[in-house]
Amino acid sequence: MRTDLFDFDLPPECIALRPAEPRDSARLLLVRPNVGVEDHSVRDLPGLLAPGDQIVVNDTKVIAAQLSGRRIGGTSEPHIDVTLIKRIDGSRWQALVRPARKLSEGDVLRFGNEGRVCLLGNLDASVEAKGEAGEVTLAFAFHGPVLDQAIADLGAPPLPPYIASRRAPDDKDVGDYQTMFAKNEGAVAAPTAGLHFTPALEAALAARGIGIQRLTLHVGAGTFLPVKADDTDDHKMHSEWGTVSEETAKTLNEARAKGGRVVAVGSTSMRLLESAATEDGIIQPFTGETAIFITPGYKFRAVDVMMTNFHLPRSTLFMLVSAFSGLDTMRAAYAHAIAKGYRFYSYGDACLLFRNAGAAS
């Protein structure tokens, strides 16, 4: 399928640089294929769903994946910016570095400065391997929980490029870029649809008889990458690690058997649930990597409703929502959102999507 079909123009002023406060005051666009759109607030969510429905959120926790350091040794010590993108093992990470041309295999990086070091001193890493487009493998001097703490001490929130290019991350982002469900560390980007939830909204959902179930998918930096191929068949999807517990799978299967719906909060929950489901729609316990790439024509097995933010043009995420509710439906919904001043991307507003009848398995 041609990727230019998923392109659209977005005025820069539509990009949210800060989240709504309080979080559940964000706007919510209800999208029903073949019915139309309605303007709501996230606080209206309980009334837009039914008793017995089950909401599924991602409880991954964003790490402070943005590191600033310098190459040590040699005749100069150039400044290097590093974004951690995927853990390899207890001491090694895949990362994106800038400027990559300043680094070679075997170089050593030192993070922090005289006024900012972790408790154990300097955090060093060697460049173990160098790939394309600024990607490297870094082997850190620390291991396991000690390394995790050092990264937390020295790192900053890894804001998406469309925010970071317009302002620097600050202390407010430490809390803003984390969902209330965040528990299991490992993401380098937030599961942003979950940012809209508050304890008050959670209580209102419970009072309506709507459950909230949890899974974990560690969101990678690939979520921000545009699709550069001219055809979706030629795009290589990034891989992310996730897990669906036996308890969550059982609860969701029982709910659907009784007529309840599975409501995926965000593309990460959606992709993991679809990866865990059998062809007949039974959700199985799952632990491992998923590189599922969902485009129009995909038959959804596990998810009936989706809550998600507004996505970048020509992104795998816009392709996913187009597969779920229909490309024409989503193009019309996004045009409405732009005209009505909805806020886009990670800190922006949300939409509640119902599945196109033709997208069911």
UniProtKB/Swiss-Prot annotation:
The keyword Amino-acid biosynthesis does not apply. The keyword S-adenosyl-L-methionine applies. Its EC number is 2.4.99.17. GO terms for biological process: queuosine biosynthetic process; tRNA wobble guanine modification. Pathway: tRNA modification; tRNA-queuosine biosynthesis. It comes from the Bacteria. Its main location: cytoplasm. It catalyses: 7-aminomethyl-7-carbaguanosine(34) in tRNA + S-adenosyl-L-methionine = epoxyqueuosine(34) in tRNA + adenine + L-methionine + 2 H(+). Pfam families: Queuosine_synth (PF02547). GO terms for molecular function: S-adenosylmethionine:tRNA ribosyltransferase-isomerase activity. Gene3D superfamilies: QueA-like. Keywords: Cytoplasm, Queuosine biosynthesis, S-adenosyl-L-methionine, Transferase. It is found in: Cytoplasm. GO terms for cellular component: cytoplasm. Belongs to the QueA family. Monomer. NCBIfam families: PRK00147.1, queA. Transfers and isomerizes the ribose moiety from AdoMet to the 7-aminomethyl group of 7-deazaguanine (preQ1-tRNA) to give epoxyqueuosine (oQ-tRNA). HAMAP family: QueA. This is S-adenosylmethionine:tRNA ribosyltransferase-isomerase. It comes from Afipia carboxidovorans (strain ATCC 49405 / DSM 1227 / KCTC 32145 / OM5). The lineage of its organism: Bacteria, Pseudomonadati, Pseudomonadota, Alphaproteobacteria, Hyphomicrobiales. The gene is queA.
